[in-house]
Amino acid sequence: MTQVAKKILVTCALPYANGSIHLGHMLEHIQADVWVRYQRMRGHEVNFICADDAHGTPIMLKAQQLGITPEQMIGEMSQEHQTDFAGFNISYDNYHSTHSEENRQLSELIYSRLKENGFIKNRTISQLYDPEKGMFLPDRFVKGTCPKCKSPDQYGDNCEVCGATYSPTELIEPKSVVSGATPVMRDSEHFFFDLPSFSEMLQAWTRSGALQEQVANKMQEWFESGLQQWDISRDAPYFGFEIPNAPGKYFYVWLDAPIGYMGSFKNLCDKRGDSVSFDEYWKKDSTAELYHFIGKDIVYFHSLFWPAMLEGSNFRKPTNLFVHGYVTVNGAKMSKSRGTFIKASTWLNHFDADSLRYYYTAKLSSRIDDIDLNLEDFVQRVNADIVNKVVNLASRNAGFINKRFDGVLASELADPQLYKTFTDAAEVIGEAWESREFGKAVREIMALADLANRYVDEQAPWVVAKQEGRDADLQAICSMGINLFRVLMTYLKPVLPKLTERAEAFLNTELTWDGIQQPLLGHKVNPFKALYNRIDMKQVEALVEASKEEVKATTAPVTGPLADDPIQETITFDDFAKVDLRVALIENAEFVEGSDKLLRLTLDLGGEKRNVFSGIRSAYPDPQALIGRHTIMVANLAPRKMRFGISEGMVMAAGPGGKDIFLLSPDAGAKPGHQVK
């Protein structure tokens, strides 16, 4: 039965733009995509969006380490993420970035509305500061012992063990993640969102019955503990959006990250030339539905701060949050050393996307339970279910239809009651997809697959094919098998997009939810081609080994000059400005009697002569070759008395030593006495 079409906006949590997509990420994106594909099959108007979370200190620091700009890094990472999601056939309508003009404008709009409505408070706070790096430390760059449950090695904003949130100043024995130094306290003026003002609204939203029971129970614990004002600002240096009329202050990444949902949708509307839909979906009284698929680690932000921000800025709240658990591999946390910390791209080098989509789907429910990817069970389940039960149903019937009946199916069903059993299951299976009871849906479908294969086994078309005068029976039996295959693939279409494409090509028809009510009668199918290949443990072993090799490549010791001679501690610009570097002409160069390391250089600074002893003899056995060259010297270095005389400066050279010392020279045109700036 056709449903009334709904307008639905679906989002996944925004992947952080400083690392690759891995199988933990993929659980959420697959779960959301299966649900979205089902909604589309039922005729609903679905907009499915995501974006990269592209702001924050981690982005800034990693870009510095790579020697590139944050903009360049997040641009490259966005392309990588989108390639991975496309490889898994995640059907996004738009994939954007929080570092966008749409997101800037919306962040400033929401902030200004909150401020106008009295929900932004200013106050001076004491904040952790890294004395070695000269920067305030964001929450995730401080680690210590959780003040609530006393678990060690927890971040400065929330505990991954007990789920508590707190200020980084509350950590026990905090350490800077950047330098390892013990942070010191410094004062800074910050901006706070007045979350407690929304306590009554949030409690009513929690009691509405829409949220998962586990989420509602956790929120009740937070209400009982009392809501706190939320610090939404960070001090420079910071990669993000500067707060209007507050120089040197930036929006905290968790303020503009969820606004990224709105920014990505706004970008999609603009691409379509659709100026109406944005307001239609986000206005206060919107009748469109809004769903966020998220992991259990970010429930606090999405269940408290996000709806409160929307309420306070006169936008609509989410219809619901769909929260999932973590992914373990072979019963344990994903491990780089064991090769079970597997990137999405690595998986696709060894297996197809449909295999993981099916395995995750078969294990998912509407509860917030962790999902274990047992790699041996994965191989057995994919082969048993997809290959043996579903694909084999088509292959064992298609041969007879193609060879004996030119691909034409029978004009009547051999067993109408069995077919009705299959189509009647649409209600139960559809409800399971709708309610995210994916494991139940798969169990129902596989039970039908068992019925279909039992029918074929009992009818034994391979026996009938050898009996004279039974061509009509053979055609009817095999046509029945192919029609049952069609129903099964229709139910599995949200899960297996690539297998569905191949099945539709064979069946010579599109698979639609309502279409299965009418069987394919007198219909011509195409020649059968292999739809899916079996997988084996050798592929798993290769996958694990490849993951280990990737870890070795990314964690291998640094080689080259920096490994043996690392960069010194950071100095300030004022420190650097004290060094006066000048261009000098080498007027004379000679050996120093009694030294096997030094050369005596006479340097012209453009009106002033200097005598400098330099330890470069091993690289320049013929001092005369240096005469007439220009070099760089430290002109304001205090004279140093040596047993050979007084050295009045230092020339600049590079290299590890010995014969590999290279005197630095300025570009052509530089004159003696010119200052190096």
From Swiss-Prot:
Zn(2+) binds at C146, C149, C159, C162. Pfam families: Anticodon_3, tRNA-synt_1g, tRNA_bind. Its main location: cytoplasm. SUPFAM superfamilies: Anticodon-binding domain of a subclass of class I aminoacyl-tRNA synthetases, Methionyl-tRNA synthetase (MetRS), Zn-domain, Nucleic acid-binding proteins, Nucleotidylyl transferase. Its EC number is 6.1.1.10. CDD domains: Anticodon_Ia_Met (cd07957), MetRS_core (cd00814), tRNA_bind_EcMetRS_like (cd02800). The keyword Nucleotide-binding applies. Disulfide bonds: none annotated. Keywords: Aminoacyl-tRNA synthetase, ATP-binding, Cytoplasm, Ligase, Metal-binding, Nucleotide-binding, Protein biosynthesis, RNA-binding, tRNA-binding, Zinc. The keyword Zinc applies. It is found in: Cytoplasm. ATP binds at K336. Its cofactor is Zn(2+). Residues 575-677 form the tRNA-binding domain. A motif ('KMSKS' region) lies at residues 333-337. PANTHER family: METHIONINE--TRNA LIGASE, METHIONINE--TRNA LIGASE, CYTOPLASMIC. Homodimer. This is Methionine--tRNA ligase. It comes from Escherichia fergusonii (strain ATCC 35469 / DSM 13698 / CCUG 18766 / IAM 14443 / JCM 21226 / LMG 7866 / NBRC 102419 / NCTC 12128 / CDC 0568-73).
